[in-house]
Amino acid sequence: MKEVDYDFVFFNGDCIDDPRDRAQASYILKQFTEGVKADQVPVFFMRGNHEIRNAYSIGLRNHFDYVGDKTYGAFNWGDTRIVMLDCGEDKPDDTPVYYDLNDFSQLRKDQVVFLKQEMASKAFKKAKKRILIHHIPLYGYEGNLCNDLWRPVLEKAPFDICLNAHLHKYAYYPKGSQKCSYPVIIGGGNSLKDATVIILEKKKNELKIKVLNAQGETLLDI
C-alpha cells in the first residue's frame, strides 16, 4: 500500500469483531487507520454483521460519521457515483440470540426505496462510473437475506463493479456469471495474512481494478 497513491479507503465490514467496549473498538480502529494514512485521506467503514453484535455494537455509532447520517447511502467522487448498502445481520430477526431486539427486515426494505430513488436521481444517471459496495454478497452466495428484496431492483442496474466481503475467501465473478448484471469482487480472509486489497483507479472514462493479497501478489488485474 505504501506505493499506491489513493484518494480514500473503504473497509468493507467485520473489521471490529463483536465489539465489547470502547477501548477494544478504539484499539482495533487505531490499527486499521494508522496503516492507511487516515490522517490524510477519508476512510469509510462499512458495517458488517459482526459490528452489529455484542455489548458495544450501538456504541460504534460514536466513532463514525456516516454519509447522510445512515449506514447506507451514496456520494460522488468526481464523476464516479459510489452507492453503499447495509445488509444487516446474516441471520433472521427471530433468531433466539437476538431476543427480539433486531429489526433488520425493515432496514432492508428501507433500502429498496433508497435504491429506487438513487437510481432515478440525476447524480446516478450522470455519473461516468458507478460502484456498489455492501458487505454480504448477493451473487455467489445464497445466504444473503436481502436477495429477494434487492435482486429485482439491481438486476438491470448499470454498476461497473460491486465490492463485497463476508465469505472470508477471495472470489471474482465477471458480469453475466452467477446471474449478476455487473462484475462482482469478494474480498479475502478474516485475518491480515489472508486479507486482500482492492484498488480502483479511474482515469477519464476508464476504470481499472487490481486485487492484491497480503503478500503483494496480484490476484486480478482488469
Protein language model regions, located:
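Active-site glycine-centered loops adjacent to acidic/histidine catalytic or metal-binding residues
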Residues: 13-14, 48-49, 135, 165-166
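Histidine-centered catalytic micro-motifs
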Residues: 132-138, 160-170
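A short C-terminal boundary segment appended to hydrolase-like catalytic domains
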Residues: 201-222
